[in-house]
């Protein structure tokens, strides 16, 4: 497998919902910040060539790394939304990354990506002309709420999946999809949604429930527990 895949890591968010004094990607867990764990998981894979970390305009917490695990780490300034930040990252990739090459996008605060999940996504996604995302089947019963807070019905879950990251698409196709969504005033919440607007049907690659995003203090506690178990 060629080491030609770059990963865009949007890290421009302030994490206001978390309620911490720092953006959540800079919170400590197991002796290093969450973003470091995320880069560990991504750059350890031999098919990943480097990372473009998209940071905020006034980010005083970025450690200033220019390499990680012996691979280049570049930075650029993001936008007001995740989609704008991902687009900025795609545009800032090195010229050696061709327009038709696949690029990964992965959440900065999703530090528990497994090598198996990443490898499976790359193996499956690069055989598809569009690309693929990691996702998890919905296993809980889903209720539809009415305006009064009462239950209006139960939704069938058989074909429902929760979108995870990484997500894998060709650089030029994803750039166009994100640009078109922005021009139309549509807020896309993940890269696959932008591609869907283009009439594309990315593949779903089942990923582990352990690939969770740290969005609350309870999530951070969960990740610290994972690290303690891993350490023995």
Curated annotation (Swiss-Prot):
- Which Pfam families does this one have? IspD
UniProt cross-references to InterPro entries, sorted A to Z: IspD (IPR001228), IspD/TarI (IPR034683), IspD/TarI_cytidylyltransf_bact (IPR050088), ISPD_synthase_CS (IPR018294), Nucleotide-diphossugar_trans (IPR029044)
Q: What does this protein do?
A: Catalyzes the formation of 4-diphosphocytidyl-2-C-methyl-D-erythritol from CTP and 2-C-methyl-D-erythritol 4-phosphate (MEP).
One of the GO biological process terms: isopentenyl diphosphate biosynthetic process, methylerythritol 4-phosphate pathway
Pathway connected to this protein: Isoprenoid biosynthesis; isopentenyl diphosphate biosynthesis via DXP pathway; isopentenyl diphosphate from 1-deoxy-D-xylulose 5-phosphate: step 2/6
| Annotated protein name in UniProt | 2-C-methyl-D-erythritol 4-phosphate cytidylyltransferase
Question: Which gene name belongs to this protein?
Answer: ispD
* Transition state stabilizer, annotated site positions: 17, 24
């Amino acid at each position: 497998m060629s080491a030609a895949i770059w990963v865009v890591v949007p890290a421009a968010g302030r994490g206001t919902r978390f309620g911490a004094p720092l953006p959540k990607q800079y919170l400590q867990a197991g002796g290093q910040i969450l973003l470091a764990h995320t880069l560990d998981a991504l750059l350890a894979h031999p098919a990943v060539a480097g990372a473009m970390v998209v940071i905020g305009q006034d980010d005083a917490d970025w450690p200033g790394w220019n390499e990680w695990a012996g691979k280049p780490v570049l930075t650029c300034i993001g936008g007001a939304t995740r989609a704008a930040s991902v687009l900025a990252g795609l545009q800032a990739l090195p010229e050696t990354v061709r327009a038709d090459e696949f690029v990964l996008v992965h959440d900065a605060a999703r530090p528990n990506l497994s090598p198996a999940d990443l490898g499976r996504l790359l193996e499956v996604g690069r055989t598809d002309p569009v690309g693929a995302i990691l996702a998890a089947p919905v296993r809980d019963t889903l209720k539809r709420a009415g305006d009064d807070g009462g239950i209006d019905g139960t939704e069938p879950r058989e074909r429902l999946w929760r979108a995870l990251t990484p997500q894998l698409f060709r650089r030029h196709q994803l750039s166009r999809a994100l640009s078109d969504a922005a021009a139309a005033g549509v807020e896309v919440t993940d890269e696959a949604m932008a591609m869907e607007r283009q009439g594309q049907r990315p593949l779903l690659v089942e990923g582990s429930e352990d690939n969770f995003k740290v969005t609350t203090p309870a999530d951070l506690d969960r990740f610290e527990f994972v690290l303690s178990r891993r350490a023995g």
